[in-house]
């Protein structure tokens, strides 16, 4: 705000001396800055708009009455409260944020894991498996949608991506490494920490 007032006073002084195109442009820029910045006018003074200034919906205010401010709820109570306040006609999305007090910049503090949901995501997942030898039949019998070796690797290089999860046996990883640039950006690259590089392929398929 001090910078804004300084520019405004400077433009007024210039305007009094000489009304030029430069001054008009400066005034226009100041006006746009004022309109686009999160400022509000209260009793003739400029104030930054805060989140509390926003008009809250009636539903939001009713939900706020059901919880105590600054109170920490245990997980079970918090989930019950979320379900109790879900009044819309569609299935609402619930986000959970965890503060782990770790710094992912350090290798020993990086976190990557897979959690198996008790009832899944509600959407069918197409699982592909890269393996060879005896594990080939194991993967098929375990219910994998696609099973292949070098042939499937070549298909993926050609643009084939008709799967949601890709599992690979450890002996295939030297060949799978060539798919890093294709699978990596899509989050499909097999990884031991994610449970998608394993010798126990039937178990991995069952988890997905």
Swiss-Prot record:
Sections of the chain in a coiled coil: none
Function: This protein binds directly to 23S ribosomal RNA.
Localization of this protein: Plastid, Chloroplast
Name of the protein this chain belongs to: Large ribosomal subunit protein uL1c
Gene3D superfamilies recorded: 3.30.190.20, 3.40.50.790
Oligomer and partners: Part of the 50S ribosomal subunit.
GO cellular component, one term: large ribosomal subunit
InterPro entries referenced in this protein's UniProt entry, alphabetically: Ribosom_uL1_bac-type, Ribosomal_uL1-like, Ribosomal_uL1/biogenesis, Ribosomal_uL1_3-a/b-sand, Ribosomal_uL1_CS
Keywords assigned by UniProt, alphabetized: Chloroplast, Plastid, Ribonucleoprotein, Ribosomal protein, RNA-binding, rRNA-binding, Transit peptide
Presence of the UniProt keyword RNA-binding in the record: yes
Broad class of the protein's primary localization: plastid
Pfam family, one: Ribosomal_L1
One GO BP: translation
GO MF entries: rRNA binding; structural constituent of ribosome
Family: Belongs to the universal ribosomal protein uL1 family.
Classification via CDD domains: Ribosomal_L1 (cd00403)
């Amino acid at each position: 705000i001090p910078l804004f007032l300084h520019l405004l006073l400077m433009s007024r002084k210039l305007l009094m001396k000489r009304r030029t195109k430069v001054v008009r442009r400066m005034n226009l820029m100041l006006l746009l800055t004022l309109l686009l910045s999160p400022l509000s006018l209260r009793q003739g003074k400029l104030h930054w708009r805060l989140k509390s200034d926003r008009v809250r919906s009636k539903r939001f205010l009713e939900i706020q009455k059901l919880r105590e401010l600054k109170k920490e709820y245990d997980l079970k109570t918090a989930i019950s409260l979320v379900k109790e306040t879900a009044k819309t006609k569609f299935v609402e999305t619930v986000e959970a944020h965890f503060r782990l007090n770790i710094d992912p910049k350090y290798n020993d503090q990086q976190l990557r894991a897979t959690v198996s949901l008790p009832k899944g995501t509600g959407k069918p997942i197409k699982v592909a498996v890269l393996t060879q030898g005896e594990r080939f039949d194991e993967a098929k019998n375990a219910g994998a949608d696609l099973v292949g070796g070098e042939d499937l690797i070549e298909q993926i290089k050609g643009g084939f991506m008709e799967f949601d999860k890709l599992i690979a046996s450890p002996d295939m990883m030297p060949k799978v490494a060539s798919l890093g640039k294709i699978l990596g950006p899509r989050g499909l690259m097999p990884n031991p920490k994610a449970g998608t590089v394993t010798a126990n392929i039937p178990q991995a398929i069952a988890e997905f």
